[in-house]
From Swiss-Prot:
GO terms for biological process: prolyl-tRNA aminoacylation. Belongs to the class-II aminoacyl-tRNA synthetase family. ProS type 1 subfamily. It is found in: Cytoplasm. PROSITE patterns: AA_TRNA_LIGASE_II (PS50862). Catalyzes the attachment of proline to tRNA(Pro) in a two-step reaction: proline is first activated by ATP to form Pro-AMP and then transferred to the acceptor end of tRNA(Pro). As ProRS can inadvertently accommodate and process non-cognate amino acids such as alanine and cysteine, to avoid such errors it has two additional distinct editing activities against alanine. One activity is designated as 'pretransfer' editing and involves the tRNA(Pro)-independent hydrolysis of activated Ala-AMP. This is Proline--tRNA ligase. It comes from Pseudomonas aeruginosa (strain ATCC 15692 / DSM 22644 / CIP 104116 / JCM 14847 / LMG 12228 / 1C / PRS 101 / PAO1). GO terms for molecular function: aminoacyl-tRNA deacylase activity; ATP binding; proline-tRNA ligase activity. InterPro entries: aa-tRNA-synt_IIb (IPR002314), aa-tRNA-synth_II (IPR006195), aa-tRNA-synth_II/BPL/LPL (IPR045864), Anticodon-bd (IPR004154), Anticodon-bd_dom_sf (IPR036621), Pro-tRNA-ligase_IIa (IPR002316), Pro-tRNA-synth_IIa_bac-type (IPR004500), Pro-tRNA-Synthase_IIa_type1 (IPR023717). Its EC number is 6.1.1.15. HAMAP family: Pro_tRNA_synth_type1. It is an enzyme of class 6 (ligase). GO terms for cellular component: cytosol. The gene is proS.
């Protein structure tokens, strides 16, 4: 491809609304352009990268035995009402009506549509297991689209759905998808981690996320420094560092604590170690009209997913208002604790091992100091309620936990029978009896992968594409292309490289574009290999080569270039 026949739309300045580096570089390199909030047009350069991601995803899904389909982006409301998600999904679901006042939505995901397809096409156990996938545009009406492709409203996703008669069959396909995803992200050249995850609103049981490691990632991922244990922050099990509760050394006493509504104020005002304080948070209970107190140590954070999974707690999690708290307990936030607490209470494992701790007295502006379980109050229900912190013991007993930032690019779920039961999807078993099918769900954020790759691979000059993703493999940059000798040598080399199957961008812009600008553009775009053809080099029988990740260029004899490039690109 020649730049004279191509849309090369690089920008010198970074647009003001671009915050993260991937958004900045995608705009500056002329790969995408903003149409509206969270909506982007893919320009030719960016589309080449996107298609490469799609190709690798498609190849590995096909190799794993999945069957490609393409489902409508617009979905009838009746299907979502059948599954119960029409109301549950919330404002992110873009709803619309046609001219006949029939309700539809623009699909953020396709569980309902694929379940409807399956119940119309599958009728016998002999057709199972089966795994369908598509690569398609989705839409979620994010309240604050941000970070370019990282969190847009419209995005491209590969979603797959498998159907099974048994849990064992699902597990086999799930394991196959786990391996396929690992191959996909390895082929894409990304440093990634698969981690245990919570299924969230999509439902079901087992789940893994695939994260690209990057300091700019939105998610905390947790893994052991001595084993294969890995989970996201929502799922990671928090194991107390203490093996047993310490002995009581203080008497419990009631202390005036005026204007002490936060842990920081309690610690600073009374010279308490933060490890000797607790936080009491009040949420709605599973039983209508009830409240439940959740207690974590002062230096720990409540894990809302773990909290919502407690049988006593309403899901989704709803925090009680101050008015509700005062009506039920007689004191407000900042003065709450487990002593004489008139509502149900669950404490975190670390709290259960505390001694001589400080807690709100459920009396305004008062705390109890020197509180000890069993002596001063019975130990309530104990559960894992908190986020892990770096240095916690690994749940598998091997090593300690490390926390890094990650960008979620893939997620696989074991859905169970949630959708098949709701939408009456069943087939006849070998015994001739109807059986609800067990489902799996497997997603990859295809357009997000492009942004994640940049977040992980860039420098001060631009993008450092993994070789599998670069829009072009080779940039040919002639100096004074209008010179006959340079033009002939460049055109000959371009023909040889393209004939050999290499993807080449020939920068044949005229002399108004300086060599420095050409070099800067090729580095910004992230083309891995640059070859410079000059009159001086030709007179010496050499061409200048520079790898995008190299600090220095080198001269190569013209006759050796093809073998050199072939060897470089075969790695």
């Amino acid at each position: 491809m020649r730049t004279s026949q191509y849309l090369l739309s690089t920008l010198k300045e970074t647009p003001a609304d671009a915050v993260v580096i991937s958004h900045q570089l995608l705009l500056r390199a002329g790969m995408i352009r903003r149409l509206a909030s969270g909506l982007y047009t893919w320009l030719p350069m960016g589309l080449r990268v996107l298609r490469k991601v799609e190709t690798i995803v498609r190849e590995e899904m096909n190799a794993a035995g999945a069957l490609e389909v393409l489902m409508p982006a617009v979905q009838p409301a009746e299907l979502w009402q059948e599954s119960g998600r029409w109301e549950q999904y919330g404002p992110e679901l873009l709803r619309l009506k046609d001219r006949h006042e029939r309700e539809f939505c623009v699909g953020p995901t396709h569980e309902e549509v694929i379940t409807d397809l399956a119940r119309n096409e599958l009728n016998s156990y002999k057709q199972l297991p089966i795994n369908f996938y598509q690569i398609q545009t989705k839409f979620r009406d994010e309240i604050r689209p941000r970070f370019g492709l990282m969190r847009g409203r419209e995005f491209i996703m590969k979603d797959a759905y498998s159907f099974h008669l048994s849990q064992d069959s699902l597990q086999q396909t799930y394991d196959g998808m786990y391996q396929a995803y690992s191959k996909i992200f390895s082929r894409l050249g990304l440093d990634f981690r698969p981690v245990q995850a919570d299924n969230g609103s999509i439902g079901g049981s087992g789940s893994h996320e695939f994260h690209v490691l990057a300091n700019s990632g939105e998610d905390d991922i947790v893994f052991s420094d001595s084993s294969d244990y890995a989970a996201n922050i929502e799922k990671a099990e928090a194991v107390p560092r203490e093996s047993a509760r310490g002995s009581a050394t203080e008497d419990m006493r009631l202390v005036d604590t005026p204007n002490t509504k936060t842990i920081a104020a309690l610690v600073d005002g009374f010279q308490l170690p933060i490890e000797k304080t607790i936080k009491t948070l009040v949420v709605h209970g599973a039983e209508e009209g009830t409240l439940v107190a959740l207690i974590v140590r002062g230096d720990h954070e409540l894990n809302e997913i773990k909290a919502a999974n407690q049988p006593l707690v309403a899901s989704p999690l709803v925090f009680a208002s101050e008015a509700e708290i005062r009506a039920a307990i007689g004191a407000g936030p900042g003065s709450l604790g487990p002593v004489n607490l008139p509502i149900a209470c669950i404490v975190d494992r670390s709290v259960a091992l505390m001694s001589d701790f400080a807690a709100g007295a459920n009396i305004e502006d008062k705390h109890y100091f020197g509180v000890n379980w069993e002596r001063d109050l019975p130990l309530p229900e104990v559960a894992d309620l908190r986020n892990v912190v770096e240095g916690d013991p690994s749940p598998d007993g091997k090593g300690t936990l490390v926390i890094k930032r990650g960008i979620e690019v893939g997620h696989i779920f074991q859905l169970g029978t949630k959708y098949s039961e709701a939408m009456k999807l069943s087939v006849l078993s070998e015994q001739g009896k109807p059986v609800n099918l067990i489902m799996g769900c497997y997603g990859i954020g295809v357009s997000r992968v492009v942004a994640a790759a940049i977040e992980q691979n860039h420098d001060e000059r631009g993008i450092l594409w993994p070789s599998a993703l670069a829009p072009f493999q080779i940039a040919l940059v002639p100096l004074k292309y209008e010179t006959e000798s340079v033009k002939q040598a460049t055109d000959k080399l371009y023909a040889e490289l393209t004939a050999a199957g290499f993807e080449v961008l020939l920068d044949d812009r005229d002399k108004k574009t300086s060599p420095g600008v050409k070099f800067a553009d090729m580095e910004l775009i992230g083309i891995p290999h640059r070859i410079v053809i000059s009159d001086r080099g030709l007179s010496e029988g050499v061409l200048e080569y520079k790898g995008r990740r190299d600090s220095e260029s080198q001269n190569l004899p013209i006759g050796e270039l093809m073998s050199f490039i072939t060897e470089k690109l075969s790695r």
